[in-house]
Amino acid sequence: MVVARFPPEHTAVHTVVMIRGSLEHQGRERTFTIIEPGEPDGADSPAETLFVFFHGSQQSGTVTRKFTNFTFDSLADRGCFVVYPDGVEQHFNDARLGLDEQTRHLGVDDVGFFISLVRYMNQHHGITRVFIAGYSNGGQMVLRLMHEVPKMIAGAATIAANLPTPGNTLPEVLRHRAHPIPYLAMAGTADPFSPYSGGDAGIGSQHRRGHGLSAHESAAYFAQRNGASNLEPTKTRRSPAVVVDRWDGEHPVELWTLIGVGHLVPSNKNYPDFLGPSTDQLVAAEVIADFFGL
């Protein structure tokens, strides 16, 4: 285990205390960034809460902090430890059969890494509740964790990541027993890499990921697993370009449809054109934190 504590860092959002940590898993050093909560005292304080954000393809924890405009750092102001894990070779080994990246070829066990990371945070920081979220490949990693270790997770969220079709899912993932988890999905209708309506997903001709369900089918799948009280979701228009479908129940599911928005994390910034249109109508980190009750 290696820990490096840095002086307070001034970001576009606020001042944070950042720690770089590492642990050994599968004989490999796995690294991560921790953002400390603002008020981590009190036996029953929210500082016992961990929020893990998984980065997208060709990113790292450091890159995704900047990519998301440091907006997830702000969850530390809500009393959470925020952790950004680093994937191996800039990817996480998600559940898609079509993931043709080094992390798959190397047999990286990112589920085991997540388990070790949670144990580390429990041992060193007293974590008792764990929420997870991810973007793109990181969102796909969240979907895998929801299947394989659901009892470790108090709530999950994905951005720009539809569920892979059964034929594009690792067989071992589908064998796990269902366990309900509150879940929020966010998807743009103009996403060029993870099509809102489903189908072939990927980045360019060299990085295809196989077929996925539509955003609505993905959310409905988890609503059914959660025992939703309504088969058809209630629909609410939050703004001209944001529509929310909600399946109620003890473990609710929400699908936030971003009309005309691309493959990105809404965070009060403009993204490169190749990702599709940006939006200033919401901040994903705030929406997700509110859904989790943080």
What are the language-model segments listed below?
Residues A185-A187:
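Short beta-strand/loop motif that positions the catalytic acidic residue
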Residues R208-V242:
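Acidic, glycine-rich loop-and-strand cores that form catalytic or ligand-binding grooves
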Residues M1-S22:
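An N-terminal hydrophobic leader/cap segment in hydrolases
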Residues A190-S194, H263-V265:
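Acidic catalytic loop of the alpha/beta-hydrolase fold
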Residues L275-L294:
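Catalytic active-site module of serine/aspartate enzymes centered on a nucleophile-bearing elbow/loop
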Residues L23-E36, P40-D41, S45-F131, Q140-E148, ...:
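Serine-hydrolase catalytic machinery in alpha/beta-hydrolase-like enzymes
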Residues K66-T71, P166-R175, S239-V243:
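Alpha-helical scaffolding within the catalytic cores
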Residues T128-I181:
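Primarily recognizes the serine-hydrolase "nucleophile elbow" in alpha/beta-hydrolase
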